[in-house]
Swiss-Prot record:
Residues 340-449, 494-623, 759-813, 825-902, 968-993 are annotated as: Disordered. Residues 343-360, 759-801, 842-862, 884-896 have a biased composition (Low complexity). This is Lateral signaling target protein 2 homolog. One of its GO terms (cellular component) is early endosome membrane. GO terms for molecular function: zinc ion binding.
């Protein structure tokens, strides 16, 4: 046994070029053992440089040993291998070819007692598993070395093991154990090193891919993107699709993966860090109408200028009418609210106390009062109508000469008088941004307020309340104002002058802290306010006297004309009204409304307005513990009470956009925020985003493009990818051109006149086919003399160059006389393909015709027997079709062949030599000599290919390498035979020549 083993070992050592799996494992394992022994023979701390070099070599040898072991397990275990579907959850950067070596190195370190940095707990848990992995791998190495000495067959592509031998059975079981342990350790180790997706996260990523795909299809239907961009994989779509997906996921498919109402831990990790800003973006997007949303999406796609120049409010969602009470762009809670437009019209036209009484308790009107439609944002912003002016909540104090609202006790009223005037200059710009004030019309306030009031009241009756939300973050706030949720601003008092002292007598005072709070905010005097602090249980009643009715009527007549021109300036105008005028305006407002206008419900209480009589109006604020008589005054508003929470949320959405001075400003801010989030995905989640976008492109590519990719034999689009100069290879054509070729289209000056005659030089065959352009190879050959730098050219070389060139440009010309020969060639090629898959070489005799410069190595080249999808070459036995002007059969050493076409990766699921399936770790490699697809082991050789113009060493497969090395420059029949065999797959082109 020992003698036989020694003989086998000596034989294996002598045959170092043996390419069988067992022999390769034997030599790789010996090299690894030698490096490990050297590494253990000295103190690494004394010689750190040497230790570092040896560790690098050790890891390389570990990679090699594990790669060969993996091939052996693929062949022996087959379907019994442990599944590794968990790799789909790994980040893309983890899936590398040397991952197995890293895992082995990590297992040895853990087994030796080391720990992963900052992962002490995980290291302790994985240490027993790491010890089991290293022990199992050592056992497998011993058994495989024994099999190398027992059952190795030199240069065998398969394992020849004796399955009746107990050692073979032991090897089989050991491989199964090692495979299971190594897979378990791989998952544990990678999970400890990087973040691995959970099942829920993986499903959420798939849903995000669906969202991206739906977004792309929606953009195509809307005309935002073109199908040509998708088919061409336009890089700009890498940025446009995520941006559009954020918009669509927030407002269009709002129940999908970007549903911000779900808990944060259920969101995808891609969008979880941006949850807060996405909620704010959603709130603003819901207030955009269709035109504004389209402009925003167009801006996100093209970065073009915004065309919307209208004011913010005029371009928002339309007001509810008698037929249509809501629009699709408003919040879903708005859709549940209705507006009694007929009552509103009666209120505007009649101005009667009976109308006011008849509608004072209508629930539908109560709902409308609590929830203003965003269509009238500009009017409500510019309106001094009681309970409706909202801009004051976001701006500081505007210019005002009157004292603020009497929120506190009588002795605090005088203190409030001085607060607004001091800061009016500092805050005018803020107010101008929101409502567009103009100081030029201050002198006309006393004469034009009636008409302004009339139009504003009509608008307010039709659109309800707008209560500001004050919780938005600084990112979406163009104006930095310190606002809280502890107060709700309304316009009942201040819009038409301050409340008179007499009215304050009937008012139960609120706390002085609330008054000081409002003073600090410098809210404009055009607004009236409810309770400043919802935590206090108090009731404020503001009564309007009878004597103010006449003045209201006069002002109502005169304000109509002014409002049409200056409705955006009402805040500034009405800050200078007297307190008596304030009562009159308030009374007139109640006549026009003739229904209650409840305020926004705060955290601690609910505010309502009720009408008691045509002349005496009580604006009642109901807190959690109100007095009984005040509760009875608003008992008929139960419908609005049940919807108060939804209304409060909707009000935040509809009024958030009032912080922006124009629609353009709002859209620009949304663009910045959305683009910022989407671009962050490109950086923080690049791997996941690439996978999602790749799937989206594959799902949405046009059908014609899919056919081109799937059937390259018919369309010859794959010819564009038959050669890639990724190794700095330069192809020199017969004319001496030194251009680098990055596609299938070669540089051939002999056909320049052909392309100039046909119009333009195309890079793809499809474009030539669409233009119905054909190239006559016979004519081009006879009329195009060779370049001056070429001394002689054979008929075969010229014809091959012309036909190959025509083929790469989509020449589909068919000659009927060659149909029979083509059919025979197809059968011959199929037989050759079967032989190629089952054998290494070919003994097919060469053709009688030959070329002097073609090496004899091509006679047995696997090019002639590889798959016909990407390695076919033109048939060269067509001298009878060539003109008599080219009769020589010799060629110079400067003539080169066209590079072989590459087989597409999708057409080669297995290595064409060892038949090993490709995985994420076993990558595909193309042989530059035959175009076949091989694994890294079967294509690890390199050799120059001067016949293709490749003077530097390039990657070739083992078979081609052996033939190139063994070739001695004999007869050239191999080229002709290769061309005949490859022409069988392309009978049309062959016959056309």
């Amino acid at each position: 046994m020992c003698d036989d083993g020694a003989v086998c070992a000596a034989t294996a050592a002598a045959n170092a070029d043996d390419k069988s799996l067992l022999a390769r494992f034997y030599h790789a394992d010996r090299s690894l053992t030698a490096v490990a022994s050297e590494l253990d023979s000295f103190d690494g701390r004394a010689e750190p440089d040497r230790c570092s070099r040896l560790v690098s070599r050790l890891r390389q040898n570990q990679d090699k040993v594990l790669a060969i072991t993996n091939l052996i397990m693929e062949e022996l275990l087959g379907e019994d291998r442990d599944p590794r579907a968990f790799r789909a959850k790994f980040p893309e950067e983890v899936l590398q070819e040397n991952l197995a070596g890293q895992l082995w190195f990590g297992a040895e370190c853990l087994a030796a007692g080391s720990s992963i940095l900052n992962r002490e707990t995980e290291s302790k848990e994985m240490r027993p598993l790491a010890q089991a992995v290293t022990k199992s791998l050592g056992n497998v190495r011993v058994l495989l070395r024994d099999q190398c000495l027992r059952n190795n067959v030199p240069n065998s592509k398969t394992l020849h093991l004796d399955f009746n031998d107990c050692t073979t059975e032991q090897l089989y079981e050991s491989l199964k154990i090692f495979d299971r342990l190594f897979a378990e350790f791989e998952l544990s180790y990678v999970s400890a090193m990087v973040q691995v997706k959970s099942r829920h996260e993986y499903e959420m990523q798939q849903w995000i891919g669906v969202l991206f795909s739906e977004t792309l299809q929606r953009a195509l239907k809307m005309g935002l993107l073109d199908q040509e961009m998708v088919d061409a994989f336009d890089p700009g779509l890498m940025f446009s699709i995520p941006r559009l997906a954020i918009v669509a996921g927030l407002v269009v498919y709002n129940k999908g993966p970007l549903n911000m109402d779900m808990p944060g831990d259920q969101l995808s990790e891609m969008f979880r860090p941006f949850r807060t800003i996405l909620i704010k973006i959603r709130d603003l997007l819901r207030n955009l109408n269709q035109q504004e949303l389209y402009q925003l999406e167009k801006l996100l796609c093209t970065n073009e200028d915004i065309n919307t120049k209208a004011p913010l409010g005029s371009s928002s969602i339309e007001a509810p009418s008698q037929q249509d009470y809501s629009t699709a762009n408003t919040h879903r809670t708005l859709e549940r609210l209705t507006v009694d437009q007929r009552n509103n019209n009666n209120n505007i036209n009649n101005n009667s106390s009976s109308s006011s009484n008849s509608n004072s308790g209508a629930p539908s009107v109560q709902e409308d009062a609590n929830h203003r439609s965003p269509s009238m944002l500009s009017l409500s912003t510019a309106s001094p109508t009681p309970s409706h002016s909202i801009g004051s909540t976001f701006s500081a104090a505007t210019s005002s000469t009157n004292p603020p609202v009497n929120w506190s006790d009588g002795d605090d009223a005088d203190d409030d008088d001085d607060g607004d005037d001091d800061d009016e200059d500092d805050d005018d710009d803020v107010d101008d941004d929101l409502v567009g004030n103009d100081d030029s019309d201050d002198d006309d306030d006393d004469t034009t307020d009636e008409h302004l009031l009339d139009d504003i009241v009509a608008a307010d009756c039709a659109s309800g309340y707008l209560i500001p939300n004050t919780n938005l973050g600084n990112l979406l706030q163009p104006q930095q104002v310190t606002l809280t949720d502890n107060f709700v601003a309304s316009d009942d008092d201040d819009g038409y002058g301050q409340v008179a002292a007499g009215a304050g007598n009937d008012e139960e005072p609120s706390t002085s802290a609330a008054t000081r709070h409002m003073q600090r905010l410098h809210l404009p005097s055009s607004d009236s306010y409810g309770d400043a602090d919802g935590s206090h249980n108090n009731t404020t009643t503001i009564k309007s006297p009878d004597s103010d009715g006449q003045q209201q009527h006069q002002q109502h007549t005169s304000s109509r004309q002014r409002h049409s021109h200056h409705h955006h300036r009402h805040h500034h105008h009405h800050h200078r009204h007297s307190s008596h005028s304030s009562h009159s305006h308030h009374h007139q407002h109640q006549q026009h409304h003739s229904q209650p206008h409840p305020h926004r419900t705060t955290r601690s209480g609910r505010k309502r307005c009720s009408l008691e009589s045509p002349t005496d109006v009580d604006v009642t604020v109901v807190q959690p513990e109100p007095e009984p008589e005040l509760v009875s005054a608003s008992a008929d508003n139960s419908t609005a009470s049940s919807l108060s929470d939804d209304i409060s949320l909707a009000m935040r959405n509809t009024t958030a956009r009032l912080k922006f001075k124009s629609t353009e400003n709002l859209l620009h801010r949304l663009f910045v925020c959305i683009a910022g989030v989407a671009d962050q995905l490109q950086t923080n989640f690049a791997s996941d985003l690439r996978q999602i976008l790749r799937s989206v492109f594959l799902m949405n590519v046009s059908s014609s493009q899919e056919e081109i990719d799937d059937i390259p034999e018919k369309t010859k689009e794959s010819e564009l990818f038959e050669f890639r100069a990724s190794e700095n290879d330069v192809i020199q054509e017969s004319a001496g051109s030194n251009q680098s070729i990055y596609s299938a289209e070669e540089v051939n000056p002999e056909l320049d006149n052909v392309f100039s005659a046909s119009g333009a030089r195309h890079s793809a065959g499809a474009s030539m086919q669409r233009n119905h352009t054909t190239i006559d190879n016979n004519n081009s050959t006879s009329s195009s003399p060779p370049d001056a730098t070429i001394t002689t050219t054979t008929t075969t070389t010229t014809t091959r160059s012309h036909v190959t060139r025509s083929r790469s440009l989509g020449d589909q010309e068919v000659v009927a006389s060659a149909a029979a020969a083509a059919a025979a060639a197809v059968n011959e090629e199929r037989e050759m393909q079967r032989q190629r898959n089952n054998s290494v070489g070919s003994n097919t005799p060469s053709s009688a015709s030959s070329s002097a410069t073609s090496s004899s190595s091509e006679q047995n080249s696997p090019v002639s027997m590889r798959s016909g999808t990407g390695r076919r070459r033109h048939q060269s036995n067509n001298e009878t079709q060539m003109p008599t002007t080219a009769t020589t059969t010799t060629t110079t050493g400067t003539g080169t062949l066209a590079p072989p076409a590459w087989i597409p990766d999708g057409k080669a699921p297995r290595c064409m030599s060892c038949q090993t399936p490709f995985t994420a770790f076993r990558r595909r490699h193309h042989c530059r000599n035959c175009g076949g697809v091989f694994c890294g082991v079967c294509s690890n050789a390199s050799a120059p290919l001067p016949k293709y113009g490749l003077t530097k060493a390039v990657r070739v497969c083992r078979d081609c390498y052996a033939r190139e090395i063994r070739s001695s420059g004999g007869g050239g029949g191999g080229v002709v035979q290769m061309q005949r065999q490859q022409a069988a797959n392309r009978p049309q082109t062959a016959s056309a020549s």
